[in-house]
Curated annotation (Swiss-Prot):
One of its GO terms (biological process) is translation. Keywords: Ribonucleoprotein, Ribosomal protein, RNA-binding, rRNA-binding. One of its GO terms (cellular component) is cytoplasm. This is Large ribosomal subunit protein bL21. The lineage of its organism: Bacteria, Pseudomonadati, Campylobacterota, Epsilonproteobacteria, Campylobacterales. The gene is rplU. This protein binds to 23S rRNA in the presence of protein L20.
């Protein structure tokens, strides 16, 4: 059984027990979270929503929040003595899927 959910502007294919990582939602660790924007559910037969499946809910538990490793962005324009170096660290929330209903 799997479901396709929309969380933080992204779509994820999840099963019970999966761990997903997405943009920070500002939730407390060990708290419960419900994803009501379920795009599709497959439990033997595929049910696709228009745009969401009515009555379908995916429940999860927040594991932790944190920051990813730094990504270095470097741009250089040749022969112009022009270069730009920036770093970026994404804040994330990690959630374990507990139930698909």
């Amino acid at each position: 059984m799997y479901a396709i959910i929309k969380a933080s502007g992204q779509q994820f294919k999840v099963q019970e027990g999966d761990i997903i990582c997405f943009d920070n939602m500002g939730l407390e660790p060990k708290s419960a979270v419900e994803f009501k924007e379920v795009l599709a559910v497959d439990n033997g037969e595929l049910t696709v929503g228009t745009p969401f499946v009515e009555g379908a809910v995916v429940k999860g538990e927040v594991i932790n929040e944190g920051r990813d490793k730094k990504v270095i962005i470097y741009k250089k324009r040749r022969r112009k003595d022009s270069k730009l170096k920036r770093g970026f660290r994404r804040d994330f929330t990690r959630v374990r899927i507990t139930k698909i209903a």
